[in-house]
Amino acid sequence: MNEKQRLEQTGQIQTASHPADRKSDLERLKAKTTKDYEKYFTSVFLPPNLKEAKKRGKEEVQYVKDFTIPDEFRGMGRGRKFYIRTYGCQMNEHDTEVMAGIFMALGYEPTDRPEDANVILLNTCAIRENAENKVFGELGYLKPLKTTNPDLLLGVCGCMSQEEAVVNKILKQYQYVDLIFGTHNIHRLPYILHEAYMSKEMVVEVWSKEGDVVENLPKVRKGNIKAWVNIMYGCDKFCTYCIVPYTRGKERSRRPEDIIQEVRQLAAQGYKEITLLGQNVNAYGKDFNDIQYGLGDLMDELRKIDIARIRFTTSHPRDFDDRLIEVLAKRGNLVEHIHLPVQSGSTEILKMMGRKYTREEYLELVRKIKAAIPDVALTTDIIVGFPNETDEQFEETLSLYREVEFDSAYTFIYSPREGTPAAKMNDNVPMEVKKERLQRLNALVQEIAAKKMKQYEGQVVEVLVEGESKTNPDVLAGYTRKNKLVHFVGPKSLIGQLVNVRITQAKTWTLTGELANEAIEVN
């Protein structure tokens, strides 16, 4: 859904099909409830619809070049404070930066204490059931604040809001929630807040299909050393276990000139590192109709900008092409760290997951990358206990991990997500077996990580100093180009700077060192 479609559906642009469509949406959700919740709905009621979310139609994605806040909303937040709690991935972190920017443009002030806030938003993650349970627990914890402060607005946004079952559960069990909006319409936050203030009823506005690409959104970035830069939105891969294509919509890329301008501005402001973000970041540009331009082309232009480091996440093996490998091999400010989720080492399981590559194709891609960038640090994601996974298929995952020798991995027990094809499969792997497999995998991950880290002892590495250690304020902490955490003693004036550190001790997940005078040759 884009802005034109939203106006049609809410009645601001009249269409012949609108009244029936809107009534059917309302009746569809109400049919799943035991009470009449229509009194909680407002004129902007747009429920999530997973069936609609799966469609990848030809509706044109609108590019809005300049975000603006209408004059009537300016000052809305004067004398009010906002609090946002963020769950999940870097995309959610970036979305929170945007929402904070909008709040402050409206006149709100930030607070770190939910009890002091006039608006509380939970920016949610839907990737696993555990993440959702945390949000529902937090909603229960926040309920007393609504009693003590009736004017408080409590909202749920992010990926969970795109799920029908979640919205239905909130309508049934958390009726004190004031607003629900999704991932595609963050730029409409001023309108949603206004509606919530004016109606004093629950406001639900979730777009289930295409979103817009909106430029020049205000942002409040955390710190001034590293920055996220969104280069695309959505995912069209539809892996059978994954809810993201439903919650984040179709793939849609920002124009390269807008991205390049943003990175140049960040470099001019003194940022040292940027991370390019996308649910499937190396599908960037595949939706362009007027130019042939991919992530490799974008990286080739960004590497010419005077900024120390450029990363990207998360990539999909299917879209990792030779052009991207060729550009990454030029190095410079393009770091030699690639996150490349494999999910399983079994071709049969990969097929059931809908990953569209085989074990052999993944290993061939790894060989290409290592041939071009011999010292590359590869990290990955792996799911254990997928429906029908046998002991032999799990052993294939272990053997692939040993062959690639990843630097680290995010490992998970399979978590069924309602509305995905895998959720309909017979989940026939007992939980005790899943846990045992996860333990074995994690033991291997730690074994190889320790081996990889040991190689750093005696080496001099470049460290971007981010601040004090979380455990010792007298120790500084920062990250290498390969994303290794380094601790060392030094003056606080080094925070935000690139320094050389000689590694004296390696642990499984951290390195310890001392300031070094030696220069590092960067190819």
From Swiss-Prot:
Residues 80-198 form the MTTase N-terminal domain. Residues 221-451 form the Radical SAM core domain. Its main location: cytoplasm. GO terms for cellular component: cytosol. Keywords: 4Fe-4S, Cytoplasm, Iron, Iron-sulfur, Metal-binding, S-adenosyl-L-methionine, Transferase, tRNA processing. It catalyses: N(6)-dimethylallyladenosine(37) in tRNA + (sulfur carrier)-SH + AH2 + 2 S-adenosyl-L-methionine = 2-methylsulfanyl-N(6)-dimethylallyladenosine(37) in tRNA + (sulfur carrier)-H + 5'-deoxyadenosine + L-methionine + A + S-adenosyl-L-homocysteine + 2 H(+). [4Fe-4S] cluster 1 binds at C89, C125, C159. It is found in: Cytoplasm. Monomer. This is tRNA-2-methylthio-N(6)-dimethylallyladenosine synthase. It comes from Geobacillus thermodenitrificans (strain NG80-2). The gene is miaB.
